[in-house]
Every structure is written in C-alpha cells, then in structure tokens.
C-alpha cells in the first residue's frame, strides 16, 4: 500500500528540477568576464544612430540652413566605437576612484572626479 502512494498518478504535476542558485556576485563576475573577452559593440546600433541623427539635426538647425546631414554607416560605426571606448575608459577610471576611496560601489562623485582629472 505504501509503495503505491509513492508512484506518480496520472494528472500529477511533473516535478521540475530546481534552478541552480549561485552565490551573490558569481553571475556578475561571470558577466564581467564575458564582456571583457568580447569585442562586439554593447550599445545597439539603431538607438545610437537615432541619437546621433537627432543631435546632428539640432546642430544643423541652429545655423538655420535647409541642408540636412546624411551619415554613412561606416561613420556611425566609427563614432560608436569611439563613444564606447570613451565610456569604458571613463568607467575604469571611475572604478579606480571608488577603490581609492576604499569602496567597491561606484558613485556619482567618483565619476565627477574621474572626468575632472581627465579634463573631459
């Protein structure tokens, strides 16, 4: 009788294996290593090009000319590479400022200090 109750009956829910839980910070470190190994761009192309076109159209509108700017795809890609390299370097300096202050969390004042030191 006891053996029969242990067997699965029709209609019983299928037991799903539990998802493995990692210690706090393990997945974050894995994600950091993944992005450090990769060389692909992290900002999506379409939103970046939209922002660039919007800023350039505002810039052209200030000079009251009727000429719109056209962008080559290679120019947008080059600009995106430079922007991402700038941001990565800024975050590296910001992290160093936080470490210097004996913290592991970056704060706004770390980024302000990094920009002030770099002259950006």
From Swiss-Prot:
Residues 14-120 are annotated as: H3-like. Histone H3-like nucleosomal protein that is specifically found in centromeric nucleosomes. Replaces conventional H3 in the nucleosome core of centromeric chromatin that serves as an assembly site for the inner kinetochore. Required for recruitment and assembly of kinetochore proteins, mitotic progression and chromosome segregation. May serve as an epigenetic mark that propagates centromere identity through replication and cell division. InterPro entries: Histone-fold, Histone_H2A/H2B/H3, Histone_H3/CENP-A. It is found in: Nucleus; Chromosome, Centromere. Ubiquitinated. Is degraded through ubiquitin-mediated proteolysis when not protected by its association to the kinetochore. Its main location: nucleus. One of its GO terms (molecular function) is protein heterodimerization activity. Residues 1-26 are annotated as: Disordered. GO terms for biological process: CENP-A containing chromatin assembly. This is Histone H3-like centromeric protein cnp1. It comes from the Eukaryota. Belongs to the histone H3 family. The gene is cnp1.
């Amino acid at each position: 009788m006891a053996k029969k109750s242990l067997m699965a009956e029709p209609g019983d829910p299928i037991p799903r294996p539990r998802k493995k839980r990692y210690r706090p910070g393990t997945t974050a470190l894995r994600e950091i290593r993944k992005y450090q190994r990769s060389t692909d761009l992290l900002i999506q192309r379409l939103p970046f090009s939209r922002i660039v076109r919007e800023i350039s159209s505002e810039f052209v509108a200030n000079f009251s000319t009727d000429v719109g700017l056209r962008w080559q795809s290679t120019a947008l890609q080059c600009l995106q590479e430079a922007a991402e390299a700038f941001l990565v370097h800024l975050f590296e300096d910001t992290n160093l400022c936080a470490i210097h202050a004996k913290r592991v969390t970056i704060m706004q004042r770390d980024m302000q200090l990094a920009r002030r030191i770099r002259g950006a």
